[in-house]
From Swiss-Prot:
Its EC number is 1.1.1.8. GO terms for cellular component: cytosol. It comes from the Eukaryota. Plays a role in regulating cardiac sodium current; decreased enzymatic activity with resulting increased levels of glycerol 3-phosphate activating the DPD1L-dependent SCN5A phosphorylation pathway, may ultimately lead to decreased sodium current; cardiac sodium current may also be reduced due to alterations of NAD(H) balance induced by DPD1L. One of its GO terms (biological process) is carbohydrate metabolic process. The keyword Kinase does not apply. It catalyses: sn-glycerol 3-phosphate + NAD(+) = dihydroxyacetone phosphate + NADH + H(+). One of its GO terms (molecular function) is NAD binding. Substrate binds at K122, R271, N272. This is Glycerol-3-phosphate dehydrogenase 1-like protein. It is an enzyme of class 1 (oxidoreductase). It is found in: Cytoplasm. PANTHER family: GLYCEROL-3-PHOSPHATE DEHYDROGENASE, GLYCEROL-3-PHOSPHATE DEHYDROGENASE 1-LIKE PROTEIN. The gene is GPD1L.
Amino acid sequence: MAAAPLKVCIVGSGNWGSAVAKIIGNNVKKLQKFASTVKMWVFEETVNGRKLTDIINNDHENVKYLPGHKLPENVVAISNLSEAVQDADLLVFVIPHQFIHRICDEITGRVPKKALGITLIKGIDEGPEGLKLISDIIREKMGIDISVLMGANIANEVAAEKFCETTIGSKVMENGLLFKELLQTPNFRITVVDDADTVELCGALKNIVAVGAGFCDGLRCGDNTKAAVIRLGLMEMIAFARIFCKGQVSTATFLESCGVADLITTCYGGRNRRVAEAFARTGKTIEELEKEMLNGQKLQGPQTSAEVYRILKQKGLLDKFPLFTAVYQICYESRPVQGMLSCLQSHPEHT
């Protein structure tokens, strides 16, 4: 007897979550392995007097977070989280990283023990012993195997079906390949590697570097300076991974889409860079710019810089990561934006 088709739930419906919903919704129509209806949990909001779930289910467009891109009709928006995840075999987590504890607490026990997850969340958390990966939190709270997906994937370009690559990291290769089957398209090409922790760290740390790149753009430093930010930022990413990853760190992972490719595209095209440039030019706070420029969505780079700063301070390692430290201090401790340049000039990579 054929196995029952696998039910998919997307936990999150922002810009990236909606772009991924478009891919999954279209793919499951063609693949008998997966159930034809995809549930998507939506944090309910009112847009122009209508519930966002009603707009998505009737107009098949997330007009707030992914306007201009139609979602497949088999993607069903649900505002009740417990109802959305009920009986799901595959969970795709794509929410701001600061909400992961609450979300996991709410759904633990409501999904089958055999369920598998994949996190597209770019961020880290602090634990009592220092670094805690988002995948670790999900794994510990829910008791399910969890893969990660990170790459050079600007959501609007993915939704427009422009070619890109991405990386899945999975400690159980079979599970990583299952998610590749669910997500891959001719224009969304996926490589699966087993160095999952490094893949996940790349996705979080590159946002800090992108903030630094945005500061340089705001100061009109030029492309040479931005290239230095990218190179030095990559060096700090590798050093951080070697210190804090539990398993072996493969330098080759940084050459995948999750590494240098994602770093480049985020430092040139991402919203962390864009908001950081505005921060440098206007003097407004990060919070003010989030409201003005991101439609209320949260920026991951500054928050991740704060978490990384506290982890490094706890371990007495701040002097080894001057770029990460400078981004935090400029965002939160009123250090002048020009401090980004002095950080580059005195970086230990040059001694």
